[in-house]
Amino acid sequence: MPDVVNVGFVPMATSARGVLFVFCDDALKFGPDTVKALGTAANAVKRAAATSQFKGKSGSTLDILAPEGLKAVRLVVIGAGKLAAIKDHDFLKLGGVLAGKIGGGKEAVTVIAELPTGAMTPAQGAAVAAGVRMRAYKFDRYKTKKKDGEDTPLNASVAIAVRDVAAAKKAFAPQNHVVDGVIMARELVNEPPNVLFPVEFARRASQLRKLGVGVEVLDVPAMKRLKMGALLGVSQGSTQPGRTVIMRWNGGKKGEQPVAFVGKGVCFDTGGISIKPSGSMEDMKGDMGGAACVVGLMHALAARKAKINVVGAIGLVENMPDGNAQRPGDIVTSMSGQTIEIINTDAEGRLVLADVLWYVAKKHKPKFMVDLATLTGAILVALGTEYAGLFSNNDQLSERLTEAGQATGERVWRLPMGPEYDKMMDSQFADMKNAGARHGGSITAAQFLQRFVDDTPWAHLDIAGTAMGAPKTDINQSWGSGYGVRLLDRLVADYYESK
């Protein structure tokens, strides 16, 4: 994983040189330590704010070069907006805004982590630091030449001045590991498909062993013995063999029931024989965003030594249209024994998940399962790119996911499920079809998956709109977002981890 910015904490009284960042509210007020640090430069801030109509709105910035009265060569004021409305994840965004204003220079960066109400808490200062790292991430390793004006990599040392350095470091340590997990997920989603095919993906997931994660890789013969006919049917059209990877972190009590996360990992999706249009097909390298999230999450949980037992499982395939490819009209038998008529070979992700969900439910018997998948285009029609679709057979799990989404800014929206939708998958020749009618596509996909979880509490997150190609934000300028890592880490930490 690239590490392009170094973030640390220093005492509040540290003298600022290079670039100085400070925060104000929507009344252009500063905290006492900030006022002291600015000294007579506060007058320059007032003049510049009036000239540029800077109002301190959340995320807005005021940039002043060589401010009189400061040793800093540059002063950047970041608006925090109305303090009464600020939420925990807003500090992450403030860190992202900060990183976006550092620029390509090599000057030292000092940040006074203070609002008008006083110094930020250790957790808030840590969130600012995490936001800096998340915004700084960039995927450009395959560019050998840079165009004129193209952004240069951010290579800076950022010192965040806080009231209690030790407490800030302690608060940042687990957040830093979560950011590592987010960046790992982004890296996987951004990689080209000729580099990240199923075997290579499995190899990278296996590197989690260094953190104490148990990793088992099921190859094609092993999956055949397990009768994973749904997954193998998708994979059979590719020269790249499929894999299923089972990751196990045992941070909880010995023998305690684990929680489980399952990810769809279609490393490239042409649609198969039901081939996709050529426009934007290159984006289908990201059809493994769910699997990327699960690997990033397992990294985060293991690195911060989460006190919980966790199973992470990913099904890895390519969906290709060669002479051995699955056909519309084929009937496959899933690991559960249920038979599936293939109506559309481009409805392949649910086939991969069907076998992996069943495997995890029966072998590991988790407290709950959450699966993540870039499953349907229909979810973008319904929710756009701001929310992931949430489907579940368990109200408590849904409520907790929703609350974790609100806390992290990785939001979910629950959509309906019900037996009325099942008839849309009735098949004349098999137990079910793999695709329903045109309408309610995200719902029927979830109804399909529910048939493979038995009585296990389960939630399905359709992340087709949030995992890749979503609009750039204050904390992500990358095509791959790493969506879901922070959401699920927060779910585990708030509700299931031993205290």
Swiss-Prot record:
Among SUPFAM superfamilies, the record links this protein to: Macro domain-like, Zn-dependent exopeptidases
Active site at K276, R350
Enumerate the Gene Ontology biological process terms: proteolysis
Cofactor entry: Mn(2+)
The organism sits in which domain of life? Bacteria
Which Pfam families does this one have?
Peptidase_M17, Peptidase_M17_N
| Molecular function via GO | manganese ion binding; metalloaminopeptidase activity
Among the entry's GO cellular component annotations, what is one?
cytoplasm
Q: So what does this thing catalyse?
A: Release of an N-terminal amino acid, Xaa-|-Yaa-, in which Xaa is preferably Leu, but may be other amino acids including Pro although not Arg or Lys, and Yaa may be Pro. Amino acid amides and methyl esters are also readily hydrolyzed, but rates on arylamides are exceedingly low; Release of an N-terminal amino acid, preferentially leucine, but not glutamic or aspartic acids
User: According to the record, how does the cofactor bind?
Assistant: Binds 2 manganese ions per subunit.
Task of the protein: Presumably involved in the processing and regular turnover of intracellular proteins. Catalyzes the removal of unsubstituted N-terminal amino acids from various peptides.
Family classification: Belongs to the peptidase M17 family.
Name of this protein:
Probable cytosol aminopeptidase
Per the UniProt record, the source organism is Rhodopseudomonas palustris (strain BisB18)
Taxonomic path: Bacteria, Pseudomonadati, Pseudomonadota, Alphaproteobacteria, Hyphomicrobiales
